[in-house]
């Protein structure tokens, strides 16, 4: 897989950089594994906006992805690599020996015709799912369960992988992509290897319209709003925000405020918190 740049025939193509989709082998999704999904467009059940800057976008059908990998010790062959409009990672379509078809997150380097399997004593190969307790130290893993049997909840984005650092008692230590080191129960399942399509981080949408196709609406800086719309608004010209620090539209501190609960039970499982990015290096927007 590689990235594709365009000649500047138009302002939109001047900055456009996309993946070349060379790894995609299937043109249409598996009919038995797609469902229609109502899009809330950032509204709750009363129609009130609870998440700003959401709406529009191209119609999508949701692909049912197997995050549990609960078909134990049954070989599956990779039949195709498909595009998924709901995530940056690709999907691998598996044909199991018993005739069932399932989607999984496509690991990096997986090929059509390759065999994958999940179980407690399966080969140490990329794409195979197994408990963390049987994986060798230093392994790169993805699609990690937080609770055994609940399905993968961590490390599912394109190009992501966690590293198995240590094993002690009933827990194993994982270094997550955020650099956080966290303890996970050893019986939790994970998939060997890293998620594919890592080149997505080098792409550029190129124009505002492609962002709208993804269902994202424009963001407006608070400093150019009226005082009734945002705490940063008002003033003559490019006036400062008039506060000790930036705040959200609802007056709460922004940029750097910790949002994790202090007494959360799982705090005992976090060995080392992720590194905090300074405000200067973050270069965040005026919310």
UniProtKB/Swiss-Prot annotation:
GO CC terms of this entry: large ribosomal subunit
Annotated Basic residues bias: 271-287
Record carries keyword Ribosomal protein: yes
Parts forming coiled coils: none
Pfam families hit by this protein: Ribosomal_L2 (PF00181), Ribosomal_L2_C (PF03947)
Keywords, ordered alphabetically: Ribonucleoprotein, Ribosomal protein, RNA-binding, rRNA-binding
Record has Nucleus as a keyword: no
Molecular function GO labels: rRNA binding; structural constituent of ribosome; transferase activity
GO biological process, one term: translation
Region named Disordered: 220-287
Database matches in Gene3D superfamilies: 2.30.30.30, Nucleic acid-binding proteins (2.40.50.140), Ribosomal protein L2, domain 3 (4.10.950.10)
Complex formation: Part of the 50S ribosomal subunit. Forms a bridge to the 30S subunit in the 70S ribosome.
Family, similarity comment: Belongs to the universal ribosomal protein uL2 family.
HAMAP family cross-referenced by the UniProt entry: Ribosomal_uL2_B (MF_01320_B)
Record function comment: One of the primary rRNA binding proteins. Required for association of the 30S and 50S subunits to form the 70S ribosome, for tRNA binding and peptide bond formation. It has been suggested to have peptidyltransferase activity; this is somewhat controversial. Makes several contacts with the 16S rRNA in the 70S ribosome.
Name of the protein in question: Large ribosomal subunit protein uL2
UniProt organism field: Prochlorococcus marinus (strain MIT 9515)
């Amino acid at each position: 897989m590689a990235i594709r740049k365009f000649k500047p025939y138009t302002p939109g193509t001047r900055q456009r950089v996309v993946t070349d989709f060379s790894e995609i082998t299937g043109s249409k999704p598996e009919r038995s594994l797609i469902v229609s999904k109502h899009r809330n467009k950032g509204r709750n059940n009363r129609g009130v906006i609870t998440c700003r800057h959401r709406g529009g976008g191209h119609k999508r059908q949701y692909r049912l992805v197997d995050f549990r990998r609960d078909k134990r010790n049954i070989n599956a062959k990779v039949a195709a690599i498909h595009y998924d409009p709901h995530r940056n990672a690709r999907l691998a379509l598996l044909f199991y020996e018993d005739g069932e078809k399932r989607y999984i997150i496509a690991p990096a380097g997986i090929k059509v015709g390759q065999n994958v399997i999940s179980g407690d004593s399966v080969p140490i190969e990329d794409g195979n799912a197994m408990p963390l307790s049987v994986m060798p130290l230093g392994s790169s893993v993805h699609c990690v369960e937080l609770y055994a049997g609940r399905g993968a909840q961590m490390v599912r984005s394109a190009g992501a992988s966690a590293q198995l650092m240590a094993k002690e008692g009933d827990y194993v230590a994982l270094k997550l992509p955020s650099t956080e080191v966290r303890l996970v129960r050893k019986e939790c399942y994970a998939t060997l290897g890293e998620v594919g399509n890592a080149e997505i981080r080098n792409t550029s949408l190129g124009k505002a319209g492609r962002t709208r196709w993804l269902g994202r609406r424009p963001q407006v800086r608070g400093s150019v709003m009226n005082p009734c719309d945002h705490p940063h608004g008002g003033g003559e010209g490019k006036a400062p925000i008039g506060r000790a620090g930036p705040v959200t539209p609802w007056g709460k501190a922004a940029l750097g405020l910790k949002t994790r609960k202090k007494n959360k039970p799982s705090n005992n499982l976090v060995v080392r918190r992720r590194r905090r990015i300074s405000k200067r290096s973050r270069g965040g927007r005026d919310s």
